[in-house]
Every structure is written in structure tokens, then in C-alpha cells.
């Protein structure tokens, strides 16, 4: 019994992993490869209570073109502009315009 426990544990772990990965679907890693699908938040977050400096967009350089034909340094900056324009500016395509 003592020798079969590690084998049983390993098989159980593999089975659970396979079931969970098939149920939860594929994982999406950042940065994505190929076509970038940008999903921006629909409303601003009130951070007036925060006294520090807020940098919502890190220094990632991944050029992206907006529907206004302006190139943004990364999807985060495009999302900020989308919020400012009340959704009129959206993702158009990967890369520079």
C-alpha cells in the first residue's frame, strides 16, 4: 500500500489537471501573439482618495492603431483615450497606423 500511494497521488493529480484545463478553456498570456483584442473598462474608477501618483499604463511598447488613425504606444493608452472620448475611439488594428 505504501508504494502505491505515490503512484495513485500522481495519477490523481494528472487527472484533476486534465479535467480542470478542459473545463476552464485555453489560457491567454500577456503579451498576446498575433491580433490583439483590446477590452477597455466602461467607466472610470474614482481614485480621488489616493494621494500618490497613479500610472495606469506601464512602459510597455506595443504600438496599436485606434479608429481615429492615431498610433498609441500600448493598448492601455488606447483605453485611456477611449474613456476620454466616451467610447468613440476604439481598437482598429495591431501596429502603427
Swiss-Prot record:
Signal peptide: 1-21
Site annotation Reactive bond: residues: 59-60
Disulfide cysteine pairs (residue numbers): 40-79, 57-76, 65-97
Annotated SUPFAM superfamilies: Kazal-type serine protease inhibitors
Transmembrane segments: none
Glycosylated sites: 51
Gene Ontology molecular-function annotations: serine-type endopeptidase inhibitor activity
Major localization class: secreted
InterPro entries linked: Kazal-type_SerProtInhib, Kazal_dom, Kazal_dom_sf
Gene3D superfamilies according to UniProt: 3.30.60.30
SMART domains: KAZAL
One Gene Ontology CC term in the entry: extracellular region
Pfam family of the protein (one): Kazal_1
Key words of the record: Disulfide bond, Glycoprotein, Protease inhibitor, Secreted, Serine protease inhibitor, Signal
Domain Kazal-like residues, every copy: 34-97
Subcellular location: Secreted
Chain's role: May be a serine protease inhibitor.
The protein's name: Serine protease inhibitor Kazal-type 14
UniProt source species: Homo sapiens (Human)
